[in-house]
Amino acid sequence: MDGAVRKREGGRAAYTELKQDVEDFLFTEAELLDERRFSEWLDLLADDLCYFMPIRSNVKFGQHAQRENTIQGQGISWFDEDKWTLTKRVEQILTGAHFAEEPLSRICHMVSNVQVLDARPSAEAAEEVTVKSRFLVYQNRLESETYLFVGKRTDVLRRSDDSWKIIRREIILDQNILQAKSLTVFF
């Protein structure tokens, strides 16, 4: 976990600075989505992005590690997308003719429990990091439709100039049956 990066890479100060930088990036991303600044959000995604959210199943005790989540490339998932498909989703929403987003939802992203699991080549000179976080996304539609999405994300971020780009995001939604009428939220 975060201690492993600190010990392996030689210093709490470097880890703390890296973690703060990553948190700032994730919080900025959440703000862009909440403010519907989708074009700027898309700029945070790498061209080779993999954006994946498996479907979860209820399984017998002891089988959850192997069978609870669908596997990418096998079966179905809520999302198995790249930057191009996310760009098309954004374009569709911005037409104003998207039935599930007209009028636009009010969204609030909360990101917490950020942990830098790995930094390559080191915390001091990180070019790529693996980050785990928790999220809560509140969605309000029309007058009285409200939905909560809760779960965890594992992101791989790549250094790009003075910031980061998301190259992989795996989203684990902590529900096996979608409670919302549609899934137009970006996580």
PLM ranges: what are they?
Residues 137-147:
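Short, cysteine-centered beta-strand-loop-beta hairpins and adjacent loop/turn segments enriched
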Residues 47-119, 125-131:
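A solvent-exposed, acidic/Ser-Thr-rich amphipathic alpha-helical stretch
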Residues 45, 135-137, 170:
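Short beta-strand segments enriched in hydrophobic/aromatic residues
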Residues 184-187:
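Short hydrophobic/aromatic patches at helix-to-coil boundaries
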